[in-house]
Each structure stands twice: as C-alpha cells, then as structure tokens.
C-alpha cells in the first residue's frame, strides 16, 4: 500500500513472466488473492525471456529453435542439476545463473567442479579438453608442441570468424583480436629472422595488411619458410599466453588448461548465441528457467507476442475482481494507526462479507447482523 500512496509511481514487475495467462494474473491482481489478501493489480509487466526467440531477436536461428523446444521448470534448478531442458551453474562473475541444458552448459558444469584446483584440473585434463571441443570456445591446443605456422593458422581459425557487422573489425571479431594476431606475426618474424641483433623491419606493421589472415600467413611463410617446421621456443609459449591476456575482447578459445580454465571459458561467452557461425548446442544460452516455457515457436513477430499478452489481460477484465475501499478496509490484516502498523480491529469483530456494497459480519457465536 505504501507504493500506491505515490501517484507518480508506475509499478512494473518482471521475472518469470513467460505466458499471457501469468501476465493477466498480475495485471488483473488475481495473483495476490492466493495469499489471502485483496486483488493487487500491477501497472505493467516486463517481458524478457518470452521475447528471446521473436523475429526481431538477434539470437541465431538454431538458438531460437532450441529455446522453443525447451520445456522449462516451475521452480529453481539447483546448481549442477539438469531438469526439463534447464540447468544451473555459475557465471563468469561467480553468480548463480540458469542455462539451457546443452554441451556448452555441461562443459561449464564440469569446469565448476574443478575451478581453482590445479591438481583436479590436470587429473581431468582429457575430459575437459573433450568437453570444450563440443563448444564454441574450444581448447586452442598444446602450443608447446606446435610450429609457428600451426600457431598462426589455429589463431586465425578461431579468431578470424567475424562477419563484418558493426560490432566487429572485418573478419576479426574485434580490433584487439587483430592486434594480437599482429603481435604473434611479429614475434615469429623476430624469432626466425637470420639477424640476432638490431631492429627488424616487420612486413606487418600496418594493421590493414591483416584484413585477410590467410594471405598474411602466406607472406610470412614466403619470408620465413622455417616457420613450417620450427617448433615454438619456450619463451614464445609463454608469450602466447601474455598475448591472450592482453586488455581487450577476451580470446574466443581456451588457451591453456590450468586452474583458471573456468575463467578462460566463461569470459565473454554469451555473444556466440547470436552468431550463426555456432550451433545452439555449442553456446551458453541464459533464459529464465520458468518463462522459457512460454516460447512456443521461433521467429514470432514481437508485435504478435505483445498482442497475445494484451488480449489475455483484456479478456480477463470483465471477470477480474473489483476492489473497493470497503473491500480493502475489511480485508486488510493491518492498519496504520497512530503512526504505527497495528492489527486491523475490524477483523477482531468477526468475519466480514460484502454483498452489493453492503457489509455484513459473522461473529464466532452469532448470526449475521
């Protein structure tokens, strides 16, 4: 009632509202009657999860299909459990979060079990690599066993997958992915150059020369054919991790299997659900565990979605309870009296009923008056 004392406040609620019926329940106020109080309608509802698969949503087509197939639950899913197409785990910020049950979320669950424990990680190293291989953020590979050419090709394979949209840098997912590739190329040039001292002029000082990474690698191999067979120097193995840790958009792969493997995996791990380059099974998807049940078909126009919610509320208006001042007074459990909340004295008299605007009451031992 304190909220309703302010005429400049609009009361909007959200979270778990996946169906028009649930929305109508809130807009008409029926929801509160289940708790033994008068109808308490809200002014607006917030639709989130239910709109994730609409035509206007930027989620990929396969993700929309999976959302429509996900049954959802009526309550919470405990951490690490899998129920009705949903699971629960930890986000990259160590907060509880719900995921759709798929290969990506199962990999996340595995990493939750070993996060921060180097011994446990190494004991399950093969299992972890296998789980990551089925996700959009695979293990990069054992860099210490790679040649320079293999390193560069693997990096380009995983990072140069951009479609050139306004958030990307040409074929690169981000400008910092381009600059990291430049760092790796120049490190290779320096390592394989015949001169051991002095400045070495790089062929790749201009970032525009990296618009096509395959061409850049071909140019490097023409200058330094030894890159095909030369295995990475131990110092360059460490340098690769330094490059991966540089500020900017996190790398789209797991560069090393260590105690921080969960952080590597969870960092920047949600955009893939909007990229058609990846299948829905490979990406983390985070709908509300209850509201996801309201998604019945992919690519429904959002206007039609809103119309369904609107119609359900309008259809319920004729039967929605009308709360009068008298209703509120007689059913209130407490009243404000003398600056304090006190038990409603009217409820001590007996049980009240309102018929045709007239109040009658029944005491415990007397008939209606």
Q: Predicted segment positions?
A:
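Conserved active-site-proximal phosphate/metal-binding subdomains
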Residues: 2-8, 27-369
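Alpha-helix-loop-beta-strand connector modules within alpha/beta enzyme cores
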Residues: 1-14, 18, 22
